Amino acid sequence: MSSSDGGSSRVSIPYHLRKTLQKIREYTGKQHSDEDIFAVYKDSFNDPHETAQKLLFLDTFHEVRSKREKKKEPIVPVTQPSGRGGRRNFASSNSYQGSGRNASFKRENGANHVTRGSRTAQPATNKASNITVPNETKVSGPASIPSEVSNHKAQDDPSLISASRCSSKSDQAIEIETASKQGKNQSLPKPDVSEQSHVTFPFHLQVAKGLQNGLTFGSFDSNFVKEVSSSNGASGGYDSNFESSHGTGDDERESSPTTNGITGVASAREETSTVSEDKDYGISNSATGAEPVVHSDHIVPPVEEVPKEEALSNTETHQIAYGQEAPLSVFGLVPSLSAIGQPVNTEAAETQPGNSNSPPISLVSYPPDQSSIAAATQQTNFLRQQYPPNFFPYGYYSPYYMPPPYIHQFLSPNGIPQQSYFPQGAALTAPSHAKPVDNTENPPTTNPYLHTSPMVASSIPSTTTLNSIHSEEKASHLTESAAAWIGQGFGNLQVNPMYNLAYQGQPLGFPVVQAGHGGLMGMHQPTQPMAAASTTYQTLPPPPHTTTAMGEPIGHPHIAYQQPQAALTNWVNNY
């Protein structure tokens, strides 16, 4: 491996660098050859430290070549496969006749068009590989020559074709096509086409011929659309390709103008591969210039219709993808016209040449001006409201419930206060003819809460009597002792937890019921009380603090308790 063995090194290593290379090998601990170390040493700009670091991360079996070796080697893409028929191989003929490694590399990457087209015989190993792998035997002439060249004819078993017959037919086809193209002054394709390899498709996938002919790695651009559309023109490129691939004569081959040279190669390969896979088709090609006769029960579409339909769908699909930007031209948000129910223009598909038998296709390529006008008809309001009309985003609801007449601006978005359930106190004005008098005697045990008024202590009065008592008591306490009766004076206030008012002497269970009626006015409908509600309240036991002396103003809050009782009776009459 080293250069000290004598003559094994292909690169001359200076004598003063051999010790340095030996030290680098000892430092790395890997058995790299002197050529590898010297190549890394040159790449590292003669820095031994960087060379050692690179060799530490370099595998021992990794092949390191110098720049001089790389220049001598032919430019062959290593990572590109051969495809279905080995369409692409761009190495020269001398590289095929080189060492065994190069020959195996060529065998992996597919057939070399130039060398296999010109060779009259092949080795036995290559013939065996061609028989087992039918992809390499179906190769036509060189891919760089724009023609419809075929070196095979469809037969029942293409593996029985001899190598000499293939080579002679390919040589004859190359000479005829070269002469015809020189007579028409058609130049060869640009070299940038040959720098890309075809996209490979499996045998079990039925791919359109337009994709097989023009699809290469990196070919998705505007030129690809033009090439496919030109091959589908009024000159009938696919018809001429099919005729020339079956050998219809020299005159017909000369009268078939095509601009895409790969079309004939792929079409011939597709026809041959189709016949080799489907053994049911018995195609007789004994006579030159005869059309293929199908002896089978299978229904095969006509030859002239299938390529047209496939090429039409292919061309229109790519024209939509690359030829125009509508119907998604309005900020990328407007859907297509066919998706929203707009009429789709199908005249463009009908006016194309060779499309009389094809069904109407919904995907039609619109011109840029027509599609932009159609998309502009949709009314798009960019200054619309964020919320629907029935949504009020500025209505704030506080954590606790607040009645409508007081802070209505937080509860309703329109700012109009809602009507309160209770009538105002000014409307209930009546002449005061009775006043509550403090009782010095003990109150009766059967009706303890009505002991402040001797008129109502005996029995339940009528509705008019209660209304008059309610009005006169409110008027009397508002005028005489308003400072001591704040809770009763503002009787129209709706009781709720916001005010935190603790009335003197009120029972604990009853104000909760009143607060529920008044505070939850807008949320709950008031229920109609029973007729015997007053008798129910009279049977309640008295609170403990009512047994105190009656000389103090403790007895007055009992009148405040009597007022809501009259209000309940008013609800029954007004309802």
UniProtKB/Swiss-Prot annotation:
SUPFAM superfamilies: UBA-like. May act as a transcriptional coactivator of LOB domain-containing proteins. This is GBF-interacting protein 1-like. InterPro entries: GIP1 (IPR044277), GIP1_N (IPR009719), UBA-like_sf (IPR009060). The lineage of its organism: Eukaryota, Viridiplantae, Streptophyta, Embryophyta, Tracheophyta. Belongs to the GIP1 family. Its main location: nucleus. Disulfide bonds: none annotated. It comes from the Eukaryota. It comes from Arabidopsis thaliana. Residues 90-102, 115-138, 161-171 have a biased composition (Polar residues). Transmembrane segments: none annotated. Expressed in roots, leaves, stems and flowers. GO terms for cellular component: nucleus. Residues 268-281 have a biased composition (Basic and acidic residues). Keywords: Nucleus. Residues 66-171, 229-296 are annotated as: Disordered. It is found in: Nucleus.
